[in-house]
A protein has these predicted regions:
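Residues lining hydrophobic/aromatic ligand-binding pockets adjacent to catalytic sites
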Residues: 1-265
Length: 265
């Protein structure tokens, strides 16, 4: 497995590949000691993983929030560990997506949005991902009601994306609802399902690259070219799969480098 160069930068002096400033890439987590030594240097302590991660990548998708909202002190620690150009995206709590299944959860959504507001105030908030369970079939009326929740509609509302994991959602009716509310369709690629490459939000796009085997350099170059076209009009957030092996993190670094090369060509 290829290894990253092992500089000793600080979070205030990032070595992130110089991709266009509106393209954010990373993985769905950072706290993996097993990423040593191929991603993290052997001498970096676990307390400094995020700080080092932010020298190589410019975003992370926080899955912790699927089960529990972060405390103020926890979020403050994360924010202080990364530079100003870094973005945190957060997966919506399962109480919203899996237990309530988007129904009667106005208070839960308000709590979720409030919990990540410090990241927004610091200019380090990416997007909020609502990942629906695989057995949640298309219900446009439920989605329409959910998108009308005040915490998602007011002028300071965060960017949002939806990952649908049942084919029935992939319809013009769904896309029209997302466009109306400036919500992104998360273009997710897994070993079982590929979301149509449709971009509904005016301001942002969402990608999740979840193949267990990772991606070849040639595939990453192709994705970089297509993502650059999407990024001409909006911010792009792209996250590779996290595993005990650092394949996803290394893929994300190569993706940012590939975007930089495409931009320079």
């Amino acid at each position: 497995m290829p290894r990253l160069p092992q500089p000793q930068p600080t979070a205030g002096d990032p070595a992130t590949p110089a991709a266009p400033p509106n393209i954010f890439a990373g993985t769905s987590g950072w706290a993996y000691a097993t990423w040593k030594p191929d991603f993290y240097p052997a001498d970096v302590s676990s307390k400094r993983f995020l700080e080092y991660y932010a020298t190589q990548l410019n975003s992370v998708e926080v899955n912790f929030t699927f089960r529990k909202l972060p405390t103020e002190s926890m979020l403050a620690g994360w924010l202080s560990a990364v530079p100003s150009g870094f973005r945190f995206s957060f997966k919506a709590p399962q109480r919203i997506t899996h237990f309530s299944r988007l129904r009667n959860c106005e208070g839960l959504v308000a709590d979720f949005v409030a919990s990540v507001r410090p990241a927004q105030q610091a200019g380090k908030l990416g997007l909020l991902l609502f990942q629906l369970p695989p057995n949640f079939k298309a219900a446009p009326h439920i989605l329409a009601d959910f998108l009308s929740i005040p915490a998602l509609k007011n002028p300071s509302a965060p960017k949002i994306a939806f990952e649908f994991r049942d084919q029935s959602w992939f319809s013009e009716e769904t896309y029209a609802l997302l466009r109306e509310h400036n919500a992104a369709l998360c273009v997710a690629e897994t070993d079982d399902l590929r979301t149509p490459d449709v971009h509904c939000a005016r301001t942002h796009a969402s990608f999740r690259m979840r193949r267990a085997c990772g991606y070849t350099p040639e595939e990453i170059t192709r994705y970089a070219s297509s993502v650059m076209a999407v990024a001409a009009a909006r911010e792009v957030y792209l996250y590779f799969k996290h595993e005990d092996e650092p394949t996803g993190a290394l893929n994300a670094v190569e993706f940012l480098r590939a975007c930089s090369k495409v931009a320079a060509s």
